[in-house]
């Protein structure tokens, strides 16, 4: 595990211990079970594909460790509505505070403002966080293979499935892909950003996409800014994308989302229709 992930795990485990003291698992489980059924994250993505559209997982993100503050005018409900109006399939909301200035309350507010299913975007190390996510309404969780051993990844996935949630499994290299394929969830996210160096290149998706079995749903993550980027990844079979920073920096988020997803624009970028 990289130094940054080790640092993140250290503060996350402190957060988890504090959360367990404040609210025992049994209490959080009761809240999670009282929630309505998850909205269906994977189902929403497939619905876009059925209509011949790209599926966008639009990210609500205030800041990041590598870029600092991304959006000063940060209003999660308004941003969620803007993404929905722009054609997003799902939302991803950062809930990590120390590195991303996120919060679970942001996820709750964003989800309440739309009908879109929501991913809790955070570093998950303990099944408690999965139950906590569902208790706050999350429809999907993230499993980052670079941060976890196989047993923990399976435990997180099993917990999510037990609560009816979807799981996005994130990888960055061949070894992580091989481990991810041992899990049950069909969504495989290829992070184009190296969490060890923060170097970002779409070549990562181009290299790994051909190795992902056809029964899995590929998600391109990080380094996606333009319709040409979508077109480039579409050439290796990707039609689902997680995009945050490039849209968060726009004054008109709805218009920027529509422009990114416009098929005609993408067709022009590739020279095809």
Curated annotation (Swiss-Prot):
Gene that specifies this protein: trpC
EC number: 4.1.1.48
Similarity comment: Belongs to the TrpC family.
Any GO MF annotation of the entry: indole-3-glycerol-phosphate synthase activity
Disulphides: none
Gene3D superfamilies in the record: Aldolase class I (3.20.20.70)
Record Pfam families: IGPS (PF00218)
Entry-linked PROSITE patterns: IGPS
Database matches in SUPFAM superfamilies: Ribulose-phoshate binding barrel
Pathway recorded for this protein: Amino-acid biosynthesis; L-tryptophan biosynthesis; L-tryptophan from chorismate: step 4/5
Protein name: Indole-3-glycerol phosphate synthase
Keywords: Amino-acid biosynthesis, Aromatic amino acid biosynthesis, Decarboxylase, Lyase, Tryptophan biosynthesis
Organism name: Bradyrhizobium diazoefficiens (strain JCM 10833 / BCRC 13528 / IAM 13628 / NBRC 14792 / USDA 110)
Coiled coil: none
Taxonomy of the source species: Bacteria, Pseudomonadati, Pseudomonadota, Alphaproteobacteria, Hyphomicrobiales
Top-rank EC class of the record's enzyme: lyase
GO biological process: L-tryptophan biosynthetic process
Domain of life: Bacteria
Reactions catalysed according to its record: 1-(2-carboxyphenylamino)-1-deoxy-D-ribulose 5-phosphate + H(+) = (1S,2R)-1-C-(indol-3-yl)glycerol 3-phosphate + CO2 + H2O
Entry annotated with the keyword Kinase: no
